[in-house]
Design a protein with these regions (language model features):
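N-terminal pre-catalytic "stem/leader" segment of glycosyltransferase-like enzymes
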Residues: 1-80, 300
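Conserved catalytic-core segment of nucleotide-activated headgroup transferases in glycan assembly
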Residues: 23-31, 154-156, 161-244
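Short beta-strand->alpha-helix junction loop in the catalytic core
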Residues: 98, 131, 147-157
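Membrane-proximal helix-turn-helix segments that form the acceptor-binding/catalytic region
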Residues: 105-125
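Acidic donor-binding loop of glycosyltransferase active sites
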Residues: 251-267, 280
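Nucleotide-sugar-dependent
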Residues: 260-272, 286-287, 291-293
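A charged, aromatic-enriched C-terminal amphipathic alpha-helix characteristic of glycosyltransferases
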Residues: 315-350
C-alpha cells in the first residue's frame, strides 16, 4: 500500500436523514459491530477508514467527499455548493441506481435541470453501475467519471457455513416489477422439488403499490398473503415474514447452497455481494456485482432456461460448485475488494 492510499480518508455524505455520523476507523470491522454494515455506499467510507454522514448541516473533517444524489436534487445541489465553498473536493454519485428509479427521478424536469447543474459543479462523478457512467457524461461531457461498484470486504470476511442446504431467493420485493420476484419463485420451485432441495424466501414489505392498495396494505399485508398462498402449493418452501437483523440475514443466506434471482433492475448488486461474503454462488440477476463476480452465472444475456440449468449443475456437481466459489473470490479480490477500491479512489481524487 502506498503512503497516499494509507492516508486517504473519504467522507460519504447523504443530504437529509437522521443517522448522524458513522466512522470506520477499523475498516470493515467485524460482523455484528454497531451501526450499518460496511456495504453499499457505506463501503466507500469503510474501505478508506473514513466516515458516513447524513444531514444537510454535517460537519466534515475529511477534505475528500463523496456526495450521494437522491430524489431531492435541489437539496443535493445546495449541499454541493456549501461543500465546495468550504474547500472540499467533491465527487457525486446517484444513490438510487436502478434504471426504473433513475427514470422516475427524471420524470420531474426540475430534477434533470438540477442534475445537470450538479454535474457542472462537481469535481468528478462515481459510476456504481454500467448504466450510470454514460448518464453523467450526458449531463456534462467533460466531467471526470470513475467506474467503481461498491466494494466488499472479501479479504476481511468469510461468512461461509460448513452445513449448506437448499436455495435462497435473492429478491424480496414482490411488487417491484423489475425484480421478477414472483417469476423467480414460480420457475425455481419445480427444480427444487425435483432435486429435493428446500427454498427460503423473505417476504419483504409491499412497496410500489397503487394508492388504494397502499392504504389497505396497512390492514392486509399483500406480500405476505401472496407468499403464504404460494407456499401452500410448494411444501419445500420456507417463508420468512419478519424483519431480520443484517447479521442473522447473512448467516441464514450462508446456510444455503446457492442464491437464485431473476432481477433485471441494473443495480450495483448487493445480492451477489452478500453471496460472495457467504462463499456461495449467486445465479441470475443483471446487477454490476453479478456480472463482475459471477460472470458465468449472471442473468445478463442468458435465458431463464439457461439460468435454471446452471442451478441444476451447481446443486449436483460439487467440484463445479467449489470452482465457481473459488473463482468468484479471486475476481472480487482483483476488482471489488476493499484494497482494490481504496487504491482506485485515492488515485481518482488525486487526479482531480
Amino acid at each position: 500500500m502506498s503512503d497516499s492510499d494509507a492516508s486517504f480518508r473519504l467522507a460519504v455524505v447523504t443530504p437529509g436523514g437522521k443517522d448522524g455520523r458513522q466512522s470506520f476507523p477499523n475498516g470493515a470491522g467485524r460482523l455484528g459491530d454497531p451501526g450499518h454494515l460496511p456495504v453499499n455506499f457505506h463501503a466507500y467510507a469503510a474501505c478508506t477508514w473514513g466516515s458516513y454522514l447524513s444531514g444537510d448541516g454535517a460537519m466534515l473533517e475529511e477534505s475528500h467527499v463523496l456526495l450521494l444524489i437522491g430524489s431531492k436534487m435541489e437539496r443535493a445541489e445546495a449541499l454541493l455548493r456549501r461543500l465546495k465553498d468550504a474547500g472540499k473536493k467533491v465527487v457525486i454519485t446517484i444513490k438510487e441506481t436502478g434504471l426504473q428509479q433513475i427514470g422516475g427521478h427524471f420524470q420531474k424536469f426540475e430534477n434533470w435541470s438540477a442534475f445537470k447543474r450538479i454535474c457542472a459543479l462537481a469535481h468528478g462523478a462515481l459510476a456504481t453501475t454500467y448504466d450510470t457512467e454514460p448518464l453523467y457524461l450526458a449531463a456534462n461531457r467533460n466531467l471526470p467519471v470513475l467506474f467503481l461498484p461498491p466494494p466488499y470486504p472479501v479479504e476481511e470476511w468469510d461468512l461461509s457455513s460448513p452445513e449448506k442446504s437448499g436455495i435462497f431467493i435473492g429478491t424480496r420485493q414482490l411488487f417491484v416489477t423489475s425484480r421478477n420476484h414472483a417469476l423467480a419463485l414460480v420457475m425455481v420451485s419445480p427444480l427444487a422439488a425435483e432435486m429435493n432441495e428446500p427454498v427460503t424466501v423473505i417476504s419483504g414489505r409491499a412497496s410500489d403499490l397503487p394508492p388504494v392498495k397502499r392504504v389497505l396494505n396497512k390492514l392486509v399485508d399483500y406480500s405476505h398473503d401472496w407468499h403464504r398462498r404460494f407456499a401452500e402449493t410448494a411444501p419445500q418452501m420456507r417463508v420468512i415474514s419478519r424483519q431480520m437483523p443484517a447479521q442473522e440475514y447473512l448467516r441464514t443466506m450462508a446456510g444455503h447452497k446457492l442464491v437464485f434471482q431473476l432481477d433485471q433492475s441494473s443495480v450495483p448488486g448487493q445480492v451477489a455481494g452478500d453471496a460472495l461474503l457467504c462463499r456461495i454462488p449467486c445465479v441470475g440477476g443483471n446487477g454490476t456485482a453479478e456480472r463482475i463476480i459471477f460472470p458465468d452465472l449472471c442473468g445478463h444475456g442468458r435465458t431463464a432456461e439457461e439460468i435454471l440449468g446452471l442451478c441444476r449443475r451447481l446443486l449436483g456437481d460439487k467440484s463445479y460448485f467449489e470452482e465457481v466459489v473459488r473463482r468468484s473470490v479471486e475476481l472480487a479480490c482483483e476488482k471489488m475488494s476493499y484494497s482494490a477500491a481504496r487504491k482506485s479512489l485515492s488515485l481518482f481524487w488525486v487526479s482531480l
